[in-house]
């Protein structure tokens, strides 16, 4: 998940440097979304993870 977030962040930074506003905004939004989903999944797995028998 975090790898995808970093990839979208890099795409957003490159698009912003080249002046593609719409693409940069979309890639930044996707990076934020993937980051938040990754954090939520991490917290869920932290609390409901593997338990000892």
UniProtKB/Swiss-Prot annotation:
<keyword id="KW-1003">Cell membrane</keyword>
<protein>
    <recommendedName>
        <fullName>UPF0391 membrane protein Ent638_0536</fullName>
    </recommendedName>
</protein>
<keyword id="KW-1133">Transmembrane helix</keyword>
<comment type="similarity">
    <text>Belongs to the UPF0391 family.</text>
</comment>
<feature type="transmembrane region" description="Helical">
    <location>
        <begin position="27"/>
        <end position="47"/>
    </location>
</feature>
<feature type="transmembrane region" description="Helical">
    <location>
        <begin position="4"/>
        <end position="24"/>
    </location>
</feature>
<dbReference type="GO" id="GO:0005886">
    <property type="term" value="C:plasma membrane"/>
</dbReference>
<dbReference type="Pfam" id="PF07043">
    <property type="entry name" value="DUF1328"/>
</dbReference>
<keyword id="KW-0812">Transmembrane</keyword>
<dbReference type="InterPro" id="IPR009760">
    <property type="entry name" value="DUF1328"/>
</dbReference>
<keyword id="KW-0472">Membrane</keyword>
């Amino acid at each position: 998940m975090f790898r995808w977030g970093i990839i979208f962040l890099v795409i957003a930074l490159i698009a912003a440097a080249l002046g593609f506003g719409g693409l940069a905004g979309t890639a930044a939004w996707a990076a934020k979304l993937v980051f938040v989903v990754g954090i939520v999944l991490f917290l869920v797995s932290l609390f409901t993870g593997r338990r000892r028998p």
